[in-house]
């Protein structure tokens, strides 16, 4: 059985290593849980997909975020999201991710939409915080809407600077056209140009979306390991607790400090917390 819960449980058993490894990628992850593993390419890791998906589907995608401060490191060429279409991750038959998943015996397209998690480590003044956090903590509006509104700001600024005017309907059309992340990631080949141009999106977290920020989220203390899941209803909480008990076992489950935090933009999240060092 595979899932993000099983992955977090494997982190718990080796939690002291978070304070020892210089680079997060060097953490001794349990490769038996993984269908792929890469360095510097999204996803850094993926959980194996279960054949029987009644309780756990598996298949979660994980990106590592390592920082020498209590700020989640920037997202290069990606925008953090709660779910990802696997067909947009695997873009060709020669994809190393596809090859690794097939070698692992995974039915890649049996689970077309994958939950996304971020394993964030921050270090500051000899202390460490580690959070395995669902992507909804960062995706408080849709990716398309984020790009759309950002492009609209650029358009408004240029119109104001140039003194030009366009109708509201034309502006809306232009903004909607430039709302797909894939449009920016393609290499553009211009005739007679000696270079090719590719726009790269870089995403940085605001203080309100920075789970490592001690002022915004004081509950996430120094030297703690945290599992952070969206929890908007009592039913969500019951479901999360049920899965956690099933995977962690009674003894480990009872060691957790369990509480909710209120996201500044996006509802409540349930946190399972342990001290990093015994």
What spans do the regions from the language model cover?
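Acidic-basic catalytic patches of nuclease active cores, encompassing PD-(D/E)XK
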Residues: 1-38, 81
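A short acidic (Asp/Glu
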Residues: 2-7, 73-74, 129-131
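Alpha-helix termini
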Residues: 12-21, 49-55, 106
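Short linear interaction motifs
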Residues: 24-29, 36-44, 92-104
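Sterically constrained small-residue positions within well-ordered secondary structures
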Residues: 36-38, 53, 109
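Short acidic loop-to-beta-strand element that houses the catalytic metal-binding Asp/Glu
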Residues: 39-52, 59
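Catalytic cores of nucleic-acid endonucleases
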Residues: 55-60, 65-129
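Non-catalytic C-terminal interaction segments of nucleic acid-processing enzymes
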Residues: 125-278
């Amino acid at each position: 059985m595979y899932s993000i819960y099983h992955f977090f449980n494997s982190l718990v058993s080796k939690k002291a290593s978070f304070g020892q490894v210089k680079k997060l990628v060097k953490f001794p992850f349990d490769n038996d849980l993984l269908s792929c593993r890469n360095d510097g390419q999204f996803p850094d890791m993926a959980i194996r997909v279960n054949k029987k998906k009644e309780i756990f589907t598996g298949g979660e995608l994980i990106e590592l975020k390592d920082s020498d401060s209590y700020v989640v490191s920037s997202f290069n060429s990606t925008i953090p999201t709660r779910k990802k279409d696997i067909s947009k991750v695997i873009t060709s038959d020669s994809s190393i991710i596809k090859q690794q998943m097939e070698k692992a015996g995974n039915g890649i397209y049996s689970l077309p939409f994958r939950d996304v998690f971020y394993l964030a480590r921050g270090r500051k003044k000899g202390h460490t915080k580690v959070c395995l956090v669902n992507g909804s903590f960062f995706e408080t509006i849709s990716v398309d809407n984020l790009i759309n509104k950002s492009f609209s700001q650029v358009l408004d600024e240029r119109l104001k600077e140039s003194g030009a005017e366009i109708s509201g309907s034309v502006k809306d059309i232009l903004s909607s056209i430039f709302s797909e992340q894939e449009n920016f990631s393609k290499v553009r080949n211009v005739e007679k140009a000696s270079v090719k141009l590719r726009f790269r999106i870089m995403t940085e977290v605001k203080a309100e979306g920075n789970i490592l920020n001690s002022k915004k989220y004081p509950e996430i203390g120094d030297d703690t390991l945290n599992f952070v899941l969206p929890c908007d209803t009592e039913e969500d909480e019951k479901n999360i607790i049920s899965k956690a008990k099933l995977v962690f076992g009674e003894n480990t489950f009872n060691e957790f400090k369990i509480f909710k935090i209120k996201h500044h933009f996006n509802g409540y999240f349930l946190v399972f917390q342990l001290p990093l060092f015994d």
